[in-house]
């Protein structure tokens, strides 16, 4: 059975990045002199991996969450998934892959301002279909130039016949990774913006002091982004997973199995006007991931309220 994503991060308004930790199997040195050895663990989960685990690329992919595209392809392979509010009251995912990159991910959709703050600290490759002019300009200014951008028109970005646009764009990860590895200018596609200035520094983190709090027992979690996006989670003590539903309908993987995750993080942040209209002329929200606020970390059937703080986007 496929292991579930380690962390699923979402918010009452949008999202903010946190990390998880776990066991590791770092090998010791065989020499007489002490030697620093890179632990054989995956960067995003902290779980044991191959010796070169931390050298594997981290790929962030924007994925649609409209009801007509479910079940999506590849989400159950992600190490980390962000959920964010977009126009029309719908939500979308930024799925992050490293330890288990599937052959296909999709449907791939467009970028938003908030994705820069999500991808910048962690991504080697950022995959999205395209974006509004203001968003693409912001991306060119703020996303680190070391992050390869892959958009429609790039190798591995394919439109599926028989599937209605715009939800027919899917990522062939093997084709994309091969193209990025072989390219001197790995960003590719129709909509890659030219970088305009140096990117903002990625936020730093510090280890917390003291023992971890015990937390309060929780059996269900209900989140309302809008009347259209109301994800619910129920703790499954047998499988040790939070199982997702969309309203009253179970959220499933492509093979029909139920979608679950080990950990949930709920972030309370602000939404402001992005300054442009969507394709249907409606308001486009912009999630603000700088500042501070409340958050809830849920794991092993328990919830702990915490405070988040992030000085810059």
Language model features with spans:
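A surface/extracellular/periplasmic glyco- and lipid-processing/surface-interacting theme
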Residues: 38-56, 60-78, 87-313
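C-terminal motif of bacterial Sec signal peptides marking the signal peptidase cleavage site
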Residues: 17-20
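N-terminal, intrinsically disordered, polar/charged segments of Gram-positive cell-envelope systems
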Residues: 28-40
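Bacterial N-terminal signal peptides that target proteins for export
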Residues: 1-8
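Bacterial signal peptide processing site
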Residues: 22-25
């Amino acid at each position: 059975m496929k292991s579930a994503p380690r962390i699923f991060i979402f918010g009452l308004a949008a999202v903010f990045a946190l990390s998880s930790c776990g066991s590791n199997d770092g090998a010791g040195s065989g020499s007489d002199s002490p030697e620093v050895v890179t632990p054989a663990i995956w960067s995003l989960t902290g779980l044991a991996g191959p010796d070169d685990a931390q050298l594997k690329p981290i790929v962030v992919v924007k994925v649609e969450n409209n009801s007509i595209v479910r079940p999506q392809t590849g989400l159950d392979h992600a190490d980390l998934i962000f959920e964010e509010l977009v126009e029309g009251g719908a939500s979308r995912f930024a799925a992050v892959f490293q330890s288990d990159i599937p052959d296909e991910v999709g449907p791939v959709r467009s970028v938003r301002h908030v994705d820069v703050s999500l991808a910048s600290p962690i991504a080697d490759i950022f995959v999205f279909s395209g974006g509004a002019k203001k968003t693409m300009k912001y991306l060119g200014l703020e996303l680190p130039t070391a992050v390869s951008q892959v958009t429609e028109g790039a190798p591995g970005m394919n439109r599926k016949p028989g599937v209605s646009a715009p939800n027919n764009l899917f990522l062939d990860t093997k084709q994309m990774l091969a193209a990025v590895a072989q390219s001197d200018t790995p960003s590719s596609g129709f909509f890659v913006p030219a970088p305009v200035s140096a990117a903002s520094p990625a936020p730093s983190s510090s280890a917390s002091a003291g023992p971890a709090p015990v937390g309060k027992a929780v059996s269900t979690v209900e989140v309302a982004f809008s009347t259209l996006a109301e994800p619910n989670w129920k703790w499954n003590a047998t499988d040790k997973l939070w199982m997702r539903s969309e309203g009253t309908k179970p959220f499933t993987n492509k093979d029909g199995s139920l979608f679950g995750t080990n950990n949930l993080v709920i972030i309370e942040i602000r939404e402001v006007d992005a300054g442009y209209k969507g394709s249907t002329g409606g308001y486009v929200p912009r999630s603000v991931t700088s500042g501070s606020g409340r958050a809830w970390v849920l794991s092993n059937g328990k919830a702990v309220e915490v405070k988040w703080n992030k000085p810059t986007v």
